[in-house]
Amino acid sequence: CRRACEKLMEDRRAGKQLKDMKGIVYYGEYLAKTDPLGANVPNPVSHVAYGYATQMCVLNPKDGKLELMVAAHDVGKAVNPLSCEGQIEGGVVMSMGFALREQYPIDENCKPIQKYGSLGLFRAHEVPKIKAIVVDKPGLNVACGAIGIGEITSIPTAPAIADAYFRYDGIRRYNLPLADTPYERKG
């Protein structure tokens, strides 16, 4: 947590060397201020978000297959830009599966009834071009300026793909995996 890192940095600024800090544990806690569920306030705060992400899907006009995914993510200061790009690409590919093919049926005891290989995961040769845009904003005064790049990479993918198909054929799709696409699994 950022507050623990700030305590560590206080020791570093005071002249402590890393080798002398071995075994020291730093604790920190952050509790976001949110409104209770159902609060009768004009603009309730239900959660705290640190990053922002947006994605766009481009379909091939001839066959309706994904041609390009553009994913822009505000990460604050990109401490490792190449790693950020990889995280974005991985999140997009994972969510393409959620959006278009993956099904994870379970039995009445919540036990999977399909093998991993038959879930509908995208294979490398099926993945479209992905343009990962790391929005790097230096100057934030927290955690070396980094905001983070994790789960947020997979959130905008399905809506972007659903919107691309709506623009392609005028059909709104409300369930995942999306029906009536070239990726729909038969049977």
What are the residue ranges of the model-derived segments?
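C-terminal catalytic domains of large/alpha subunits in multi-subunit enzymes
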Residues: 2-187
